[in-house]
């Protein structure tokens, strides 16, 4: 559970850290969108190099990004296997019944794997280089136009902020409960998949109790401090775009142009 990086922030003063959170949020979603435009080895290689360059600019060790892949590795491998066995085309390397391993299947599987890794790396970069509070402020700022149709933007941003803030806390609490149960002789890795799922069930009740207790304490603390929601709240930090944000936007456009040129 402690491998999950969602909601964790690594302090720093890198070029990526100093970008406006709105720029990072928009760039991340834009990047995830253009990843699906890649359709050959040249485009995927270019996207991979661009991603490594952004990681280098952030000053965050690559090990953190590899940790972000680990919790999803089985989902990635399952998707890759489906592509390999069910996509047909090109040279047939193996065939048994309705299962095939073909040239196109292997290529598709490799592309799916790289695509997953790139998306996870970019999502991890956004999380590790942006404080949850700044990310919530960015969402609130970008959703401001929805206030015209009476969407509670401030409340939605608060919910996002609390969720991002307490995901690491919840994961740490889960790890503590698992360690306590291991000390009592519980082996979460023993037996088949159904036995392992059964072993996880005793975690749920103390985890739910801990979550509700934390939520109640947070609500009490907010009431004690006189918190009032609404659009009339002021902010200490005002978001402003700087030259580096426009440079980042230009870089994404250049990346898109190169991607379109290299597409098969």
From Swiss-Prot:
Q: How does it sit in the membrane?
A: Multi-pass membrane protein
- Where does the source fall among the domains of life? Bacteria
Provide an example Pfam family for this protein. Answer: CbiQ
Localization recorded for this chain is:
Cell membrane
Give one GO term, molecular function aspect: transmembrane transporter activity
Where does this protein chiefly localize? membrane
Q: Is Acetylation there in the keyword field?
A: no
Q: Which InterPro entries match?
A: ABC/ECF_trnsptr_transmembrane, ECF_transporter_component, EcfT
Q: Where would you find the membrane-spanning parts of this chain? A: 24-44, 45-65, 72-92, 106-126
Q: Which UniProt keywords apply?
A: Cell membrane, Membrane, Transmembrane, Transmembrane helix, Transport
Task: Tell me a GO cellular component.
Answer: plasma membrane
UniProt entry tagged with the keyword Transcription regulation: no
Q: Which family does it belong to?
A: Belongs to the energy-coupling factor EcfT family.
Report the protein's function: Part of a common energy-coupling factor (ECF) ABC-transporter complex. Unlike classic ABC transporters this ECF transporter provides the energy necessary to transport a number of different substrates including 5-formyltetrahydrofolate and thiamine. Expression of the complex plus FolT or ThiT in Lactococcus lactis subsp. cremoris (strain NZ9000) allows 5-formyltetrahydrofolate or thiamine uptake respectively; 5-formyltetrahydrofolate or thiamine are not taken up in the absence of FolT/ThiT or the EcfA1A2T complex. Deenergized L.lactis subsp.
| Assembly, per entry | Forms a stable energy-coupling factor (ECF) transporter complex probably composed of 2 membrane-embedded substrate-binding proteins (S component), 2 ATP-binding proteins (A component) and 2 transmembrane proteins (T component). This complex interacts with a number of substrate-specific components, including FolT and ThiT for 5-formyltetrahydrofolate and thiamine respectively. May be able to interact with more than 1 S component at a time.
Query: What name does this protein carry?
Result: Energy-coupling factor transporter transmembrane protein EcfT
Gene (name only): ecfT
